[in-house]
A protein has these predicted regions:
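Transmembrane helix-loop junctions in multipass membrane proteins, especially transporters and channels
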Residues: 35-40, 103, 182, 218-226
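Transmembrane catalytic cores of multi-pass membrane glycosyltransferases
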Residues: 52, 59, 203-204, 215, ...
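Membrane-interface coil-to-helix junctions
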Residues: 24-125, 145-166, 205
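Membrane-embedded helix bundles of polyisoprenyl
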Residues: 23, 119-131, 137-219
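Hydrophobic alpha-helical membrane-interfacial segments at the cytosolic entry of transmembrane helices
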Residues: 17-24, 190-191, 214, 224-231
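Membrane-interfacial loop-to-helix junctions in multi-pass inner-membrane proteins
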Residues: 10, 133-138, 224-231
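Start-transfer (signal-anchor) and selected internal transmembrane alpha helices
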Residues: 1-36, 230
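Membrane-interface starts of transmembrane alpha-helices
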Residues: 15, 102-109, 113, 135-143, ...
């Protein structure tokens, strides 16, 4: 297994790095063109990101440094269940990286988290593209960059907790393929688990999409899959 993984990385590392860093750098250049960069006077905080998300990430930073309870906080109205806040806003795998920022620099933290998530979306789609499309290897990278910089992601980039869903969506689709074609459920299970832990809001929508995608794929190749459904 280790040798297989090493061989995979040896053969594909340039494409994997490109799928991550090209959208990462393109988005960073776009931000730079409008005056957004680390420690700049402008930031990625807009709309709810300014009034809510930066404060939520700062409070999570307090949790990580032992200054606040993980289970309940009094820093919102009359208090609230902090775990419910995490389940929608702060459940992403990259969120703990705010530990390395001061609360005063939280706009910079969200700037880097946004770029990391966009780059990760590109890398995630590369895995799907490689397994799905029989096209030249650099075309997989082109598709990955296009996916990571789609208009929805760019337009809603200030809604940072939504970006995680686009990291897991390609893995969910790839997991459906593996379940249908190889009867291997592990990738789909892990992808769903991380998706719903990260953001149940998009998890619900991607769950519905998965249901429809499964049937669409089944009926477009009925002769191949009908025996498995009956079985």
């Amino acid at each position: 297994m280790k040798n297989k993984s090493r061989q995979f990385l040896k053969n594909n590392w340039p494409y994997m790095l490109a799928s991550f860093f090209i959208p990462f750098l393109i988005m960073a250049i776009i931000y730079l063109s409008i005056g957004i960069y680390p420690r700049s006077s402008r930031s990625v905080l807009a709309s709810d990101a300014f009034s809510q998300f930066s404060n939520f990430h700062a409070s999570f930073n307090n949790v990580l440094h032992g200054k606040q309870s993980l289970f309940y906080t009094w820093n919102a109205s009359l208090g609230l269940n902090y775990l419910s806040l995490i389940s929608y806003y702060l459940g992403g795998l990259f969120t703990p990286l705010v530990f390395f920022f001061n609360n005063q620099n939280m706009p910079d933290a969200l700037y880097f988290l946004t770029l990391l998530k966009i780059g990760s979306a590109g890398l995630s789609f590369w895995f799907l593209a490689k397994q799905t499309f029989k096209i030249p290897k650099w075309s997989h990278v082109t598709l990955s960059v296009s996916y990571a910089l789609m208009s929805f992601i760019v337009a809603h980039s200030e809604l940072i907790m939504w970006l995680d869903a686009f990291i897991y969506l390609p893995l969910v689709i790839l997991g459906i393929h593996r379940l249908m074609d190889q009867r291997k459920p592990t990738l789909l299970f892990v992808s769903y688990f991380l998706l719903f832990i990260t953001n149940y809001y998009f998890g619900f929508m991607i769950g519905l999409f998965s249901f429809l995608y499964y049937f669409a794929r089944t009926f477009t190749d009925w002769q191949r899959y009908k025996s498995r459904i009956v079985a």
